[in-house]
Amino acid sequence: MRSRDTVTYSLVFLLLVSIFSGIYVPEKNLELDENNDMKIESISKNNNLIDIPAWKINDRWNYNGYLDMVDFIVDSGVNTDLQTLTGTLESTVTDIYVTTVDNSSSLVYKVESQGYYEANNINLDGQPGDLEVNMDTISIIRASDLATVSQEATIDINFCRDFLWWCVDISVGTLEVDQSYSPPLEGYDFPLSVGESWSQDYTATTTYDGSSDYVDIPEDTVSQRTANYEVVSQGFSGVSYASCATSYNISSTNADGEDTGYKWFCPAVRGDVKMETIESLGFTAVHSLSSYQATSRQKVISIDVEFPLSPIDMEISAWVNVSNNNGNPLANEQLQFRYEIEGDIQTITTASNGSAHVTFNTGTSADNSDSGDDLGSHGILAWINSANPHTGASTVTIDPNVYEIDLYVNQDGVSVERTRENLTLTLDENVGFNAIRDDAITFSIPVINRGLRVSPPTVLQIEGPDGTLSLIHISEPTRPY
C-alpha cells in the first residue's frame, strides 16, 4: 500500500514542479515545392511591434488544460493506464504595489492562480481509483516588462482508491514550493517583433516545505540557469478565441538547447492565449484560453514616447495621457511616472487636455535579456496610486547605433500562412513548408525603421524562388521602431 501511494505521489510531484520550467524554440527553414504555384497576397508595410500591456486588479484569465504523462510513464516502468490529467487554471490580478526587486524600487502585479486537475478511473500498480490535484499559486510579476520575480505554489494531492462500492480518500501529501529568480525571468522582451531573440542567465532559488506520509520533501536548491527565447511567428495559435487570430509565438530552449515549450501572446487579452511546457523527464503541460475577463477601466492611461528607439544617455520627452473609458481627457489627475531602470520616479499632474509632459534621460543601462541588437529595452510606467489603482505602460529601446532613418528587412521575421479551401494555417517546421496548386500563400515581411524620423515612401524588392523580381511599393510612411 505504501509503495503504490508513493508512486502516485512521485508522478504528480514531478509533473507539477515542471510548471516552473521554460519554453522551447524551433528553427525555421522555408521549403516550397518547385511545382506548386505561389503568390504574394500581402506585404506588411511596417513591422507590427507589440508593446507591453497594462494590467488591472481583477483582470482574469481562465484556461482549460491537460498534463500529458505518456512518455514519462513509459520510461518510469510504472504499471498504469494513466496518460493525462485534465483540468482548469484560473489566474487573477489581485494587487498592484511597489516593492524592492534586486535592490531597485519596482512596481509589481500580484497574480493568484487556482488549478484543478484530475484523472478518473485509472489504475496505478493494481490500485483502481481517481487522482486529484489542487494547486494554488501566487506569482509576483514586474509591471515594467512582465518579468517573473517569484512564484509560490501549494499543491495538494489526493488519490481516491476504489474499495468495493466506496472510494477511500488517501491524502498523498501537501507540497509548498517557493521559487525566486535573480534577475527576474524575462519570458517577454517588449516590444515584441517576429524574428527577435534574446537570452538570459539567472539564478533560481527554490525552497520546499509540506508534509507527506509517503515521500520525503525535497531539499532546497540554488541553481544557475540560461534561457533562450525567440518570437518565431505571428498568426493563428490553434485556439479559436475572439480577437486572437493574430498572436505571437514565443519559444525557447534551455542551456543545453533542449526544447522546453512555447506560448502564444495575444495583445487583445493582454496575455497568453496558449501555453505549452515540455519537460525533459517526459511530460507536457498544455493550457488554452477559455475566457478573459478584463475589469472595467474607468481611467485609461497611455504613454507616448518621443523616441521609442533612442540613443543612449539622451534627454527625451514623454506624454502621459489620462482619459475616461469614453475617451474624454481627465484634468488634474496626479500620477507617478516611473523609469525604474535609472531610478527616475516623478510625480506629475495632467493639464486641461488630460496630458502631462515629462522629460527623462534614457541612460546607459543594459537589460538582462541580451538580444544582441540593442543595449536594452526598458519599461516606462505611469500609475495612479489609489484604492482603485490604474496603470499605463510603454517601452523605450536604447541603442548606441541609431540613425535618423534606418530601414531594413528582418528576414528571420518572415511569417508564412497557407490558405487551402478556406482553412488558414501558419506554417512552421512542425507542419512543414509545402503547398499545392491553388493554395494561397501569404508572406508577412517585417520592414523595420530603426531610425528616429518617419521614413518617406519607398520600394521593397522581392525575389521569388523562381528568380522572379517583384517590386512592392510602401506608400505609407514607415514610423520609427
What are these model-derived regions, one by one?
Residues 271, 292-409, 413, 449, ...:
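The feature marks long extracellular or luminal low-complexity segments
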Residues 30-137, 153-306, 397-401:
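Acidic, serine/threonine-rich low-complexity disordered tracts
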Residues 189, 345-349, 433, 471:
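Beta-strand-rich interaction surfaces with strong enrichment in secreted/lumenal proteins
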Residues 472-481:
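Single conserved hydrophobic/aromatic residue that forms the stacking wall/gate
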Residues 1-62, 244-250, 295-300, 318-322, ...:
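Secretory targeting signatures
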Residues 59, 196, 314-316, 333, ...:
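Surface-exposed loop/turn positions
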Residues 307-314, 417-418, 425, 432-439:
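Short, solvent-exposed loop/linker segments at the N-terminal edge
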